[in-house]
Amino acid sequence: MRQILIVLLLAYSATSLADEAALFKQANFPVQWNDGSQVMPRKSQIVLTYLWADIYAAALFTQPDITPQQAFNEQRDLRLELFYLRDLDHSDITDACTTILKRQHSVAFLASQQAALKKLQSSFGDIKRGDRYALDYDPKRGLNIERNGTVIYNSQNHELAKLYLGIWLAPEGLPEKLRQDLLAQRQ
């Protein structure tokens, strides 16, 4: 019985890795991001799975000479792309974000960002399978939110940018292993 369990676990692990590769292929993240003024290589990519359901694939791009962690900590140029693998209701997304942000920040800080956060979250609606969102941060321009290649939101509020990117890149956001994988500089 024990041997059967081990074989099944190994088979599941191999299938999971193969499935992840197929999901990355489907997401088709570029090896580098070029916005016309700079080229940022893809540093990492992950797949978020919740209760055996694949939710999205994500890729992180930063300048070549810094780590993803430095880019986030120092608020340098970075781009986080999300390719959605299933439909999601807007209310489910905002509820999940609110839960994470409450874990990460004080009530007072969240209250100071509430109006800006509400405006950001109202910029997008329900997500459909195949939608591609990007959180693109440039210290000079601020944070752009893109949906399928079109900018749908911009804010020059640097605290809001760090707050929202922190859902994926700060502790207490993503499951820790996924967060570390996203910050790990692996393609």
What do the predicted segments below correspond to?
Residues 152-178:
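Flexible glycine-rich active-site/ligand-binding loops centered on an Asp-His dyad
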Residues 1-4:
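Positively charged n-region of N-terminal signal peptides that target proteins for export
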Residues 147-149:
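Short strand-turn-strand beta-turns centered on an Asx-Gly dipeptide
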Residues 177-187:
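Cysteine/selenocysteine-centered motifs that mediate thiol-based redox chemistry or coordinate metal-sulfur cofactors
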Residues 65-140:
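Mid-length scaffold segments of soluble, non-membrane domains
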Residues 11-15:
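N-terminal signal peptide c-region/cleavage motif recognized by signal peptidases
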Residues 19-73:
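N-terminal structural module
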